[in-house]
């Protein structure tokens, strides 16, 4: 199977850069520092108007754990309907029980809304209690792929687990490595694990055009980030990653 590179895109512009670099598809997210949250309908619509490659949208209403209230599930169902109406090809989600198991009721509701779309179970997988059992459940319920760092802080640290999951999957579901994948380690991951799907942001920082600055003021209150630069996917970095994967 051909190698696939999914770009975690934080904006419509990053989606454009991903396509220019030759990415297979994008996962469109807001709130990247929080692990990704659902982007606005406006961002989705603009992204769809700019690129032809598939767009998968994360369905995650907030940061934090993956145990959701009934109100949050209702919002997630609504977001899936919006994603479908805007012509996106797939959605990315995952709901857990308080014990770290597969939440049958919550996931079933989302799966029903997403019928006919591409389905990715996101890195909620990495904090589940029994990953090998969870993998079988995802296969049985119809997910097309699972995004995972191998239940480790980064995919490189979890490469042995990723390889084991890929062996267990045996082509029944895609195993897509994500978290900390860079130009310097993507080949190592590919050769060590045997997987063919990779998820990376491949971003660089774009300096702000603001000339007047008040750098001591942060919009995040207690969470301090650089307000005068923004991360954006680099078409050149994507192209380099594609070339590396094609050479394996």
Swiss-Prot record:
The keyword Cytoplasm applies. It is found in: Cytoplasm. Pfam families: CutC. GO terms for cellular component: cytoplasm. Gene3D superfamilies: Copper homeostasis (CutC) domain. Keywords: Cytoplasm. GO terms for molecular function: copper ion binding. It comes from the Bacteria. The keyword Cytoplasm applies. Its main location: cytoplasm. Belongs to the CutC family. This is PF03932 family protein CutC.
């Amino acid at each position: 199977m051909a190698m696939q590179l999914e770009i975690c895109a934080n904006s419509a512009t990053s989606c454009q850069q991903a396509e220019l670099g030759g990415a297979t598809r994008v996962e469109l997210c807001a709130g990247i520092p929080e692990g990704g949250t659902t982007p606005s309908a406006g961002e989705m619509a603009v992204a769809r108007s700019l690129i032809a490659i598939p767009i998968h949208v994360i369905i995650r209403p907030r940061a934090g754990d993956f145990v959701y209230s009934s109100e949050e599930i209702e919002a997630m169902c609504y977001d899936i309907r919006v994603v479908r109406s805007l012509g996106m090809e797939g959605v990315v989600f995952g709901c857990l029980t308080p014990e770290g198991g597969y939440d049958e009721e919550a996931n079933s509701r989302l799966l029903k809304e997403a019928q006919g779309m591409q389905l990715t179970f996101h890195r909620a997988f990495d904090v589940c209690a029994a990953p090998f059992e969870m993998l079988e459940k995802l296969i049985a319920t119809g997910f097309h792929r699972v995004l995972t760092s191998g239940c480790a802080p980064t995919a490189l640290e979890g490469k042995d687990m990723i390889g084991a999951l890929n062996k267990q999957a045996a082509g029944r579901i895609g195993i897509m490595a994500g978290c900390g994948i860079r130009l310097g380690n993507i080949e190592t991951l590919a050769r060590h694990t045997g997987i063919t799907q990779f998820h990376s942001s491949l971003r660089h920082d774009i300096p702000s055009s603001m000339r007047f600055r008040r750098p001591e003021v942060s919009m995040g209150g207690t969470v301090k980030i650089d307000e005068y630069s923004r991360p954006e996917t680099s078409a050149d970095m994507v192209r380099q990653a594609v070339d590396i994967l094609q050479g394996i």
